[in-house]
A protein has these predicted regions:
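A generic structural signal for nonpolar/aromatic side chains embedded in well-ordered alpha-helices
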Residues: 117-118, 145-149, 276, 354
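Short, solvent-exposed secondary-structure junction/capping segments
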Residues: 43, 76, 91, 96-99, ...
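Active-site helix/loop module of the DD-peptidase/beta-lactamase fold
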Residues: 13-15, 29, 54, 58, ...
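Short, conserved catalytic-motif segment at the N-terminal edge
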Residues: 7-64, 84, 100-104, 139, ...
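Short solvent-exposed beta->alpha transition segments
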Residues: 387-435
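Active/ligand-binding-proximal structured segments within catalytic/core domains
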Residues: 72
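Catalytic loop of the DD-peptidase/beta-lactamase superfamily, centered on the K-T-G motif
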Residues: 1-45, 175, 180, 184-188, ...
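Cytochrome P450
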Residues: 158-162
Length: 486
């Protein structure tokens, strides 16, 4: 979605969203950035960044809280790609961990693997209130904590449960595997090579042009500055300070893993960035009575919305809230940073506003063979030709419906709407096309007396051929053939 084509009402909607959160005293201040693969498109802010009344801007640093986990995951995958570790390695290969107990289990559970911790399926309890106060824990104290062992909620690798402790363990794995501290490795291997020069784990080292925001928490009817934790053994769960512009640049780079051959492979391969954005542990959620598919990737949440797959992560920390979200198919995304504790920042809601305003393109670029097949189908509608059918159809088509019956159906449908040679060659964009894959297409066929919907799916065997074709009255469902029905 080119930024130049973004409707003005998209920015108006987001301005209203963040302004309403400040006016309702949900947060003292907020800033957002809308971005595409080409960089920021527009931004806005509301409220204050600190007690001096200054307004936050896209170059003001906030704590991004658990959005930091995407950096932790990327660091692990970078070490994996270098051959230093495997996601199948037990965490105990790198960390001295005491006994792990699963109450009620008949045998001692196995130690979680690195991959299980990345996907939030390490069997550790959800621990937000406790873990958010542990960032400054020393490495010595963390070593002692690990040696005491852990009580598990499930066998590692069997189900989703969000655990900050799991990502603190990954921070230690990075330290042991790389020979550098977690913060040094992320800074030297991810932040600096990507030009994220204003980001830091320590507010005192953050060089954001717009300064560093003061974090607040609510006490009665007043905002009070929140205590600031310093870097330590739990920095890998949520310790980064970033500007909205730099977090948007990070998200844009992650999303750019989708066009094969994307830039930045020297920092982390595009295939590994795509791996972060795949669903590795299912966690269906119920929203307004409806179950929505989703779960956890590696350091990122992955959910299926009505607009398609959305990748995101929310962050909540004493004094700060954050959310980043993007739509991989269009690489259009939103970052929102706020300076209030656990404010449930609404970046996914903002992204839906932007997608609705921009209009969604076809989900995937069609194969040339799919576009050519549409022309051949309309050629058959205008005048049946067995030679055209022979080169168009895969070998299953005549087995699924004998040729004479298929011909009769197509000829009858064409006569019903008055389709002829003069009706062909309408631009595809004017035919209400929809697609869920490069290999399928549904579009409207318009004749002299009416319209119908046509849906085709192609095989992957070269040369791709049509394996199913469905003609239906406009407004009826063509979906069954695309899902495997006949």
């Amino acid at each position: 979605v080119p930024g130049a084509n973004m409707p003005a009402d998209a920015q108006s909607a987001l301005d209203s969203l963040v302004t309403a959160r400040v006016m309702s005293e949900t947060v003292p201040g907020a800033v957002y950035v809308v971005f595409t693969a080409d960089g920021p498109v527009f931004s806005g802010s509301a409220g204050v960044a600190g007690g001096d009344g200054r307004r936050p801007c896209p170059d003001t640093a906030f704590r991004i809280a658990s959005c930091t986990k995407s950096f932790t995951a990327a660091a692990v995958l970078r070490l994996r790609d270098a051959g230093v570790l495997s996601l199948d390695d037990p965490v105990a290969k790198f960390i001295d961990i005491g006994p792990c107990e699963l109450p009620g289990a008949q045998s001692a559970p196995q130690t979680a693997t690195i991959g299980a911790l990345l996907a939030m399926s390490g069997g550790l309890a959800t621990d937000n209130p406790w873990a958010d106060r542990q960032e400054s824990m020393s490495e010595y104290e963390f070593t002692a904590l690990c040696r005491r062992g852990f009580t598990l909620t499930s066998a590692p690798g069997t189900r989703y449960e969000y655990s900050n402790l799991g990502y603190a363990l990954l921070g230690r794995v990075i330290r042991q595997a790389s020979g550098a501290s977690y913060r040094e490795y992320v800074t030297d291997s991810l932040l600096r090579p990507l030009g994220l020069s204003h980001s830091a784990f320590d507010a005192a080292q953050c060089t954001a042009p717009g300064g560093v925001t003061v974090g607040f928490h609510r006490v009665g009817d007043q905002w009070r500055p929140a205590a600031v934790s310093t870097p330590g053994a739990f920095s890998s769960i949520g310790g980064l300070y970033m500007t909205a512009n730099e977090l948007a640049a990070w998200c844009s780079w992650l999303a750019a893993g989708y066009p094969w051959g994307a830039i930045g492979d020297d920092v982390l391969a595009a295939s590994s960035r795509r791996e972060m954005q795949q669903l590795h542990q299912l966690d269906p959620v119920r929203v307004q009575g409806q179950v929505r598919a989703g779960g956890y990737g590696y350091g990122l949440e992955v959910e299926l919305h009505d607009c398609g797959v959305v990748v995101s992560h929310r962050g909540g920390y004493p004094g700060f809230s954050a959310q980043m979200a993007w739509h991989p198919e269009t690489q259009l995304g939103v970052v929102i940073l706020e300076n209030a504790s656990y404010a449930q920042t609404p970046a996914v809601t903002a992204l839906r506003h932007v997608l609705a305003a921009a209009g969604l393109p076809t989900r995937s670029a069609l194969w040339p063979a799919t576009i050519a097949a549409r022309d051949e189908v309309e050629r058959l509608l205008a005048r049946w030709d067995d030679a055209v059918a022979d080169r168009l159809f895969a070998d299953n088509v005549d087995l699924d419906l004998p040729r004479q019956h298929r011909r009769a159906e197509i000829v009858s449908a064409a006569m019903r709407i008055g389709f002829c040679e003069e009706c062909r060659h309408r631009p595809l964009a004017s035919c209400e096309p929809t697609s869920t894959s490069p290999a399928n297409l549904e579009w409207t066929v318009t004749g002299q007396r009416g319209e119908l919907r046509c849906a085709i799916t192609l095989t992957s065997v070269n040369p791709p051929k049509v394996q199913s074709i469905t003609l239906s009255s406009k407004g009826s469902d063509c979906q069954q053939d695309r899902d495997g029905g006949r």
